[in-house]
Amino acid sequence: MATLKDQLIHNLLKEEHVPHNKITVVGVGAVGMACAISILMKELADEIALVDVMEDKLKGEMMDLQHGSLFLRTPKIVSGKDYNVTANSRLVVITAGARQQEGESRLNLVQRNVNIFKFIIPNIVKYSPNCKLLVVSNPVDILTYVAWKISGFPKNRVIGSGCNLDSARFRYLMGERLGVHPLSCHGWILGEHGDSSVPVWSGVNVAGVSLKNLHPELGTDADKEHWKAVHKQVVDSAYEVIKLKGYTSWAIGLSVADLAESIMKNLRRVHPISTMIKGLYGIKEDVFLSVPCILGQNGISDVVKVTLTPEEEAHLKKSADTLWGIQKELQF
């Protein structure tokens, strides 16, 4: 007896489903799901896989997204506790880990999250040996180093979301002051994602007009307009949002989808993201910090050599020393 489906549809070939643009998100907390929905809305994947240890929450989030399939263009949304659901991913976004508590520094989280990564990373490598790893969990620079060490991947394929969001916050706040859309406000925050990030005031511009040339005190203590406060707001913003709503999610989700787009579409856009910077700016250790990187289908293919003031370079070196001080104590 022919089924309804048989009566309706005449099959022409037996297809093997192998995804070509699969993205996995590890961790279905607020950040993971914000990344997932942002990636879905940008139509970057032909399959999205979600992984977590909390099975009920995981299944619920998957179903909730599947029920929106009519409004999306990603034909397959899957999930599982077992990493076999992640097989053949081109990009794996890692958001899993202990969440930063109110008032807790990102660095304080570190050993808790290293232990989680010791389980996650080998499983990802097993099922998607050719993927790019995009680390979002905090402290992101150290955990990107941890992911690189555990995975054995070449450094171009291990990327930290880094200062992509810090720079976006900076450009938003700058735009608010000037009455200009953030896309037209150019400025870079480099170094550590977090408390010791470095604003590159010399490069801040609108339409190629250097703000530092117009206003030489820009970013200094002598500045009567207190532009330095903009960077302080960037540093404080995550803490403020956590204090108000308990966590951050939307902006980091959008930031991650922005990076995913550059990778999946091989855009070769320049982003301030965390990469291994040994050999740059006099840094001699295996540390990951944000510098402007060209991002495409192979991950980070090139780094843009930014001219920093001696003060900015010293700041970056200090960040590197702080991170290395923590990294060398880590138990793998």
From Swiss-Prot:
Subcellular location: Cytoplasm
Protein residues bound to NAD(+): 29-57, 99, 138
Enzyme class name: oxidoreductase
Pathway named in the protein's UniProt entry: Fermentation; pyruvate fermentation to lactate; (S)-lactate from pyruvate: step 1/1
Swiss-Prot/TrEMBL catalytic activity: (S)-lactate + NAD(+) = pyruvate + NADH + H(+)
Keyword Metal-binding among UniProt keywords: no
Residues carrying N6-acetyllysine: K5, K14, K57, K81, K118, K126, K224, K232, K243, K318
N6-succinyllysine PTM sites in chain numbering: K5, K118, K318
Residues at the active site: H193 (proton acceptor)
Gene Ontology MF terms in the entry: identical protein binding; L-lactate dehydrogenase activity
Positions bearing Phosphotyrosine: Y239
Xref: InterPro entries: L-lactate/malate_DH (IPR001557), L-lactate_DH (IPR011304), L-lactate_DH_AS (IPR018177), Lactate/malate_DH_C (IPR022383), Lactate/malate_DH_N (IPR001236), Lactate_DH/Glyco_Ohase_4_C (IPR015955), NAD(P)-bd_dom_sf (IPR036291)
Cross-link (Glycyl lysine isopeptide (Lys-Gly) (interchain with G-Cter in SUMO2)): K57
Keywords: Acetylation, Cytoplasm, Isopeptide bond, NAD, Oxidoreductase, Phosphoprotein, Ubl conjugation
Binding site residues for substrate: R106, N138, R169, T248
Residues where N-acetylalanine is found: A2
Matching Pfam families: Ldh_1_C (PF02866), Ldh_1_N (PF00056)
GO cellular component: cytosol; oxidoreductase complex; sperm fibrous sheath
Enzyme Commission number: 1.1.1.27
GO biological process: glucose catabolic process to lactate via pyruvate; pyruvate catabolic process
Positions of post-translational Phosphothreonine modification: T309, T322
PTM remark: ISGylated.
Family of the protein in this entry: Belongs to the LDH/MDH superfamily. LDH family.
Subunit field text: Homotetramer. Interacts with PTEN upstream reading frame protein MP31.
Function: Interconverts simultaneously and stereospecifically pyruvate and lactate with concomitant interconversion of NADH and NAD(+).
Protein's name in the database: L-lactate dehydrogenase A chain
Organism expressing this protein natively: Sus scrofa (Pig)
